[in-house]
Amino acid sequence: MRIKPLGDRVVIKRLEAEEKTKSGIVLPGSAKEKPQEAEIVAVGPGGLVDGKEVRMEVKVGDKVLFSKYSGTEVKLDGEEYTILRQNDILAIVE
């Protein structure tokens, strides 16, 4: 199944959190924070949003940092994704 976001929305797939601390301690699943780094898997067309022209600055495959509590989590074909607005993306990681 493909998902096509509308307007200035993007679909991201979170990158896995570290399983060990720098000192080598293994973290149980409940202790790991939600990762704030993700890969863009789909990008909306941009266009008029709230009466202003929005140009999409991210593309599929970009690695990004995003606001911790932003977006809507969805599950498709057993995979978890987050749909959020482009302005919830803080930076592109190069």
Swiss-Prot record:
Pfam families per the UniProt record, alphabetical: Cpn10
PROSITE patterns to which the protein is assigned, alphabetical: CHAPERONINS_CPN10
An annotated GO BP: chaperone cofactor-dependent protein refolding
Molecular functions (GO terms): ATP binding; metal ion binding; protein folding chaperone; protein-folding chaperone binding; unfolded protein binding
Locations listed in the record: Cytoplasm
Family: Belongs to the GroES chaperonin family.
NCBIfam families (alphabetical): PRK00364.1-2 (NF001527), PRK00364.1-6 (NF001530), PRK00364.2-2 (NF001531), PRK00364.2-4 (NF001533), PRK00364.2-5 (NF001534)
Assembly and interaction partners: Heptamer of 7 subunits arranged in a ring. Interacts with the chaperonin GroEL.
Protein purpose: Together with the chaperonin GroEL, plays an essential role in assisting protein folding. The GroEL-GroES system forms a nano-cage that allows encapsulation of the non-native substrate proteins and provides a physical environment optimized to promote and accelerate protein folding. GroES binds to the apical surface of the GroEL ring, thereby capping the opening of the GroEL channel.
Protein name (record): Co-chaperonin GroES
